[in-house]
Every structure is written in C-alpha cells, then in structure tokens.
Amino acid sequence: MTDLHTDVERYLRYLSVERQLSPITLLNYQRQLEAIINFASENGLQSWQQCDAAMVRNFAVRSRRKGLGAASLALRLSALRSFFDWLVSQNELKANPAKGVSAPKAPRHLPKNIDVDDMNRLLDIDINDPLAVRDRAMLEVMYGAGLRLSELVGLDIKHLDLESGEVWVMGKGSKERRLPIGRNAVAWIEHWLDLRDLFGSEDDALFLSKLGKRISARNVQKRFAEWGIKQGLNNHVHPHKLRHSFATHMLESSGDLRGVQELLGHANLSTTQIYTHLDFQHLASVYDAAHPRAKRGK
C-alpha cells in the first residue's frame, strides 16, 4: 500500500469514527478519493506533498473529458478539498492544493416527485405476507416524515415514540431530528411490530430483512422499485423520490419553507429552496388550466 492509499485509509477512519458518517456517505468518499489516487499514481506521485493546484486542475479536466457530469465533478472536488483540509490539519500538507479549483456550474435539475394520486396508489399495496407489511410501513414512514434512505435503514425500535407519533433520526453531520410521522405510519409500524418477531432476530433495527438482519439500503431500493411496477406507476420509484414528494406536497399545502427545511434536516435554506421551483410549477399548471386569460397569444 502506497502513502497515497495509507493517508486515504486514515482519513476514511477519521470520517467513520470521529465524524460518524453513514456507510453510504463513506462509500461515496472512498470512490471519489480512489479516482484521485489512480490519477496521482499514473502521474508518478508517491505522496500527497507532491500534489499541486495544476495537478488538481488536470484531474478535473480529465474527469470531464471522461464524461463526468458537472454535478458529479463538483462532488468529487468537494471530497478532495475536504481530504486535503484534513491533511493540513494533520500537518501533512502546508496548504490545500484544491482550494482554488472549482467545477463548472452544474445545471439546476428539479427533483422528480410522485403526485398525490400516484402516491396513494403506491401506498395501497396488497398486504399478503409479513414482508409486504414491512414494506408498507417503510413506505409510510419515508413519505410520512421525508426521511433520507440512510435515516430509514438506521432506525432502531428505541427511536420510536408511537404514543406521540414521532421518531428520532440521526441525519447528516450526526444531527438528530425529532419528527412527526402521522397516524397512518404509526398504524403500519404497529402492524409490522406485531409480525417482526417472526424473523427471530435480536437486532435492534426497526426494519429487518427476511434473514433477520437490519435491512440494507440496496434492499429498500429494490423493494420500492418492485412495488412501483406492481402498483402501475409510470415512473421509477426510488426512496429519494418519496423524500422529494414529501417536501413538495408539504410546501404546496403549507407554503412554510422554514418548516420544511427543519423537517428535511437541511443545514441551509438554499437546499430547500429548490422546492419553491416545484411549487411554482404546480401553481403555473393550475393557472394554465383554470384562468380564462391563460392561453396567451390566441
């Protein structure tokens, strides 16, 4: 293992132990940093002390030429800047060579969501076995509270307060949130808890796989996609789309951007503001359908 790999391994341990980042986030960091390790090795670097701003810029250019999108490149450079900042804090580097290197601005894509009618159809699944009950409970909780996938699979039974209809989740940056989940979600969690012991696990996890272990993020993605097809939804159903749908429907109903920010666990309001564009799309479609002067130019 080279010094390049050794430093990255140390950094990943720091993120896991000190920062307590989720396994999914750690895997993303690892993938981004493996790309720069490969590039640095190809260019003859033996240690990060040999890396300079020119090399980081060349790395960014090469990544773009290989088809990496602007948003993905921004993520890669962000991971690299964080890594170099850590090396500076460890007195391994004097300065961060990635500090002044920026990715081209990514086009702003509005997140896709599921409309209310389709969401009701998705949730109205045929409950014919314990795993279907579990899936219904997961769908209700994710849509009812707008959870991230990592927050859903990380739920333990001790995080529930069913009497008050709330859950505690650990979000990004180890920030805890206490969230309402609604009556339907509470009812389906209770239904699932009645069946959960059939899997014979002593695991603390709320949602279990058929093997009695904490359900994996990949398994949740697979099951949600399968239910989307079974329920006849035209668009691919994935967990983050339920989070987008929660945010969109909450904003359409309440108009309370700050409240939605708190529920989603966004550190910055600007992250939540993208949903105001979705809300405007909804209002514009209502206007075009209903207002007598909407059909302009005719």
From Swiss-Prot:
GO terms for biological process: cell division; chromosome segregation; DNA transposition. The active site is at R148, K172, H240, R243, H266, Y275. InterPro entries: CB (IPR044068), DNA_brk_join_enz (IPR011010), Integrase-like_cat_sf (IPR013762), Integrase_catalytic (IPR002104), Integrase_recombinase_N (IPR010998), Integrase_SAM-like_N (IPR004107), Recomb_XerC (IPR011931), Tyrosine_recombinase_XerC/XerD (IPR023009). Pfam families: Phage_int_SAM_1, Phage_integrase. Disulfide bonds: none annotated. Residues 2-88 form the Core-binding (CB) domain. The keyword Cytoplasm applies. GO terms for cellular component: cytoplasm. It comes from the Bacteria. FtsK may regulate the catalytic switch between XerC and XerD in the heterotetrameric complex during the two steps of the recombination process. It is found in: Cytoplasm. GO terms for molecular function: DNA binding; tyrosine-based site-specific recombinase activity. Signal peptide: none annotated. Belongs to the 'phage' integrase family. XerC subfamily. Site-specific tyrosine recombinase, which acts by catalyzing the cutting and rejoining of the recombining DNA molecules. Binds cooperatively to specific DNA consensus sequences that are separated from XerD binding sites by a short central region, forming the heterotetrameric XerC-XerD complex that recombines DNA substrates. The complex is essential to convert dimers of the bacterial chromosome into monomers to permit their segregation at cell division. It also contributes to the segregational stability of plasmids. In the complex XerC specifically exchanges the top DNA strands. Forms a cyclic heterotetrameric complex composed of two molecules of XerC and two molecules of XerD, in which XerC interacts with XerD via its C-terminal region, XerD interacts with XerC via its C-terminal region and so on. This is Tyrosine recombinase XerC. It comes from Shigella dysenteriae serotype 1 (strain Sd197). The gene is xerC.
